Amino acid sequence: MGRAIMLQGTGSDVGKSLLVAGLCRAAKRRGISVAPFKPQNMSNNAAATTNGGEIGRAQALQAFACGLDPTVDMNPILLKPETETGSQVIVQGQRMTSVAAGDYAKLKPTLLGPVLDSFNRLKAQYDLIIVEGAGSPAEVNLRSNDIANMGFAEAAQVPVLLCGDINRGGVIAQVVGTQAVISPADAGMIKGFLINKFRGDPKLFDEGYEIIKNHTGWPGFGVLPWFTDAWKLPAEDAYDIKTPPRKGGLHIVCLHLSRIANFDDMDPLSHEPGVQMTMLRAGEVLPADADIVILPGSKSTRGDLAFLRAQGWDIDLAAHLRRGGHVLGLCGGYQMLGQSIADPDGIEGPPGTTEGLGFLDITTVMTPQKRVARITAKHAQSGAMFPAYEIHVGRTDGPDCARPFAYVHGQPDGAISQNAQVTGTYLHGMFTDDAFRAQWLAQFDVTQNASYTATVETTLDALATHLEAHADVDGILALAR
């Protein structure tokens, strides 16, 4: 059986996901058989596994850092928010139910079993498991039946490293305060701390570092400077999306929907020197110089269509098309482009039918069956083959489907308008393929100059080197039990 170490944070967005990816790559470079694990994640940015399940995309990146294909055991519980107060519950890759936030607490006691089953399977396969917590163990109001932080660490007997974020300020209180509010037993599970996101000269924090050690009795494992290349890796949270400031070239605008999903579809495009990528947020007007507008995936398609209209983006899109611009809809965004979206069974919310944007002559009916698959598709226009994945509910039909975007196992996918300005597809991840991305950009007279997979590989290596330069990586890995 393998050993394990768990990285928990003093709060959300302290950099846990990135640090786990970096530690995974550092362990792999040491010749260690390593895998990532996150008991519970909350994200609409999901990845498809080879066996038809879905997990958080952060765990897929961590698996990539280990040189592994992602499996459902790496993230056995995935919560996908559908509304402000409810989420879809994915257990070991498959949809279990949808629950309101208050009801999830009642469900949690039944989920520790599957979590431990997945964890133990990984331990039997690999020498080292690097576990990522969620949120913070200082949220002691959630400690009862916890499966994400100390509840899991206690059940699985995994030692913990606590990470604080100095960039947001108050990191001494973050770390010392965490020890103050958790139980002595939980505090005993924590074997040290790490400070992340320091800007400037880390030596300026020497005194603060010693204060934390003296107050907690925990050893420190380093002060990590801000990792400037983090934007080159897929973001887990939509609000963490960073695009390089770039003027000129092909201007692609992505609508930042309220329940945006699989937004990392845009990452490979944003890396291209010949592309200016803009994430359009609530209250902003679609730029008149936009060449292509992307409607991304959504966890609540009808709800996000209402959100889109509330921003006036439906009017902006119509004007954009009149100017000769192009529109690409991905998954939920594809469904929005049609004449109507019917949800008779209330799969994504209250039952009913919503009028679509009407830019494609198609209609969509939501169905209970969810399709999750990693596939190889054939581009209808060029015949080029490319890898992609699907995560969606719904069936789409209509006259414009006679002009498909691609073929999957010989079956048509997507639709293209008669004037070829509007395209929709259920496929995700297609732009990660360098050859296909080059071909797609060429139709807009843009030369592809970046290798996305190579960029991610290089950045993960740089991240591991960054950790090795500023943290006691060998000491951290030696904590594993």
UniProtKB/Swiss-Prot annotation:
Transmembrane segments annotated in the record for this chain = none
Superkingdom assignment: Bacteria
**Which pathway?**
Cofactor biosynthesis; adenosylcobalamin biosynthesis
* Keywords, ordered alphabetically: Cobalamin biosynthesis, Glutamine amidotransferase
Q: Which SUPFAM superfamilies match?
A: Class I glutamine amidotransferase-like, P-loop containing nucleoside triphosphate hydrolases
Q: Name one GO molecular function term.
A: ABC-type vitamin B12 transporter activity
| Keyword match Iron-sulfur | no
Active site (UniProt): 331, 428
Please describe what this protein does.
Catalyzes amidations at positions B, D, E, and G on adenosylcobyrinic A,C-diamide. NH(2) groups are provided by glutamine, and one molecule of ATP is hydrogenolyzed for each amidation.
What name has this protein been given in UniProt?
Cobyric acid synthase
